[in-house]
Amino acid sequence: MSYQPTPEDRFTFGLWTVGWQGRDPFGDATRRALDPVETVQRLAELGAHGVTFHDDDLIPFGSSDTERESHIKRFRQALDATGMTVPMATTNLFTHPVFKDGAFTANDRDVRRYALRKTIRNIDLAAELGAKTYVAWGGREGAESGAAKDVRSALDRMKEAFDLLGEYVTSQGYDLRFAIEPKPNEPRGDILLPTVGHALAFIERLERPELYGVNPEVGHEQMAGLNFPHGIAQALWAGKLFHIDLNGQSGIKYDQDLRFGAGDLRSAFWLVDLLESAGYEGPRHFDFKPPRTEDLDGVWASAAGCMRNYLILKERAAAFRADPEVQAALRASRLDQLAQPTAADGLEDLLADRAAFEDFDVEAAAARGMAFERLDQLAMDHLLGARG
């Protein structure tokens, strides 16, 4: 298998990823700003499928209408020249100080109304550029102290906002769905809808739940100490994995945004195995930050590394699934039984079946080994390249 990516691999990057200048709370930028046109061209050369953007990534905040149209025109020309696509777009509702207390859940009503109009304006552009997914990350929706935010009222306002956006998209006839991106904390002390589970539960309360799914990010779920592949599996099970953000994270700490494959490599292996075996057809979107130690050559090396690592893990996961010893080990661990309904014969037959309870030998069942260690070591052998 070649580790050289092609557009058919559906790898995408946000303008804000490779465009991150290295500025953090403790230090200034270490790299110059990148022109979005340059970003499109370089990512196309690396084999990417598309780019994504916040409104302010493409059009500097406060631009006049004339300036806005000029930025969009140049961007379109770059897309046309390279064949790159825009599968997803989103709104920056976190950088400007006006959003210091949030956007859709800000205590100030006028800020909430402004946030909705800002979002709607970029939804129009997203649809114009062919995006099929609109991501919503509520990075400022939260609080640092208990009395500062009435969470129930805030969730009412969050629901109101998404219902209005769904109404707008429907009224305009846009072929666009929303993907809510959870995160437990940072920049706020506590963020609303902190995990995939919270977001999935929230979506079921919306007026048009079919329009909404999730955009889980590797590092965000791991910041909460959760198993990312398990969260993705539940999103797939619910039919709600509308988009995914791939990066790397090393445990429960600040949001590291490492290149994909860095950090928890075992989790990355199981994630790729899941996405590929489940037939996920959406973009493989990298939301990472090249370390501020890197110059621009390092930025592009980091982006290339994201794609290369995914392709290597894809190859290793496929070899794992095709290995006859692995298939035997899966049967020994009774994974085939887990795929069978527990009571396909119905409740009446279950209650009448003495072997299910009265005659069930609990001691014999308790003594059965599960053979998980053998299965896991086979996975490790494939991950580490010890098996072909």
From Swiss-Prot:
<feature type="binding site">
    <location>
        <position position="220"/>
    </location>
    <ligand>
        <name>Mg(2+) 2</name>
    </ligand>
</feature>
<keyword id="KW-0963">Cytoplasm</keyword>
<dbReference type="GO" id="GO:0000287">
    <property type="term" value="F:magnesium ion binding"/>
</dbReference>
<dbReference type="InterPro" id="IPR013453">
    <property type="entry name" value="XylA_actinobac"/>
</dbReference>
<dbReference type="InterPro" id="IPR001998">
    <property type="entry name" value="Xylose_isomerase"/>
</dbReference>
<dbReference type="GO" id="GO:0042732">
    <property type="term" value="P:D-xylose metabolic process"/>
</dbReference>
<feature type="binding site">
    <location>
        <position position="217"/>
    </location>
    <ligand>
        <name>Mg(2+) 2</name>
    </ligand>
</feature>
<keyword id="KW-0460">Magnesium</keyword>
<keyword id="KW-0413">Isomerase</keyword>
<comment type="similarity">
    <text>Belongs to the xylose isomerase family.</text>
</comment>
<feature type="binding site">
    <location>
        <position position="255"/>
    </location>
    <ligand>
        <name>Mg(2+) 2</name>
    </ligand>
</feature>
<feature type="binding site">
    <location>
        <position position="257"/>
    </location>
    <ligand>
        <name>Mg(2+) 2</name>
    </ligand>
</feature>
<feature type="binding site">
    <location>
        <position position="245"/>
    </location>
    <ligand>
        <name>Mg(2+) 1</name>
    </ligand>
</feature>
<keyword id="KW-0859">Xylose metabolism</keyword>
<feature type="binding site">
    <location>
        <position position="181"/>
    </location>
    <ligand>
        <name>Mg(2+) 1</name>
    </ligand>
</feature>
<dbReference type="GO" id="GO:0009045">
    <property type="term" value="F:xylose isomerase activity"/>
</dbReference>
<feature type="active site">
    <location>
        <position position="57"/>
    </location>
</feature>
<dbReference type="Pfam" id="PF01261">
    <property type="entry name" value="AP_endonuc_2"/>
</dbReference>
<feature type="active site">
    <location>
        <position position="54"/>
    </location>
</feature>
<dbReference type="GO" id="GO:0005737">
    <property type="term" value="C:cytoplasm"/>
</dbReference>
<feature type="binding site">
    <location>
        <position position="287"/>
    </location>
    <ligand>
        <name>Mg(2+) 1</name>
    </ligand>
</feature>
<dbReference type="InterPro" id="IPR013022">
    <property type="entry name" value="Xyl_isomerase-like_TIM-brl"/>
</dbReference>
<dbReference type="InterPro" id="IPR036237">
    <property type="entry name" value="Xyl_isomerase-like_sf"/>
</dbReference>
<keyword id="KW-0119">Carbohydrate metabolism</keyword>
<protein>
    <recommendedName>
        <fullName>Xylose isomerase</fullName>
        <ecNumber>5.3.1.5</ecNumber>
    </recommendedName>
</protein>
<comment type="subunit">
    <text>Homotetramer.</text>
</comment>
<keyword id="KW-0479">Metal-binding</keyword>
<feature type="binding site">
    <location>
        <position position="217"/>
    </location>
    <ligand>
        <name>Mg(2+) 1</name>
    </ligand>
</feature>
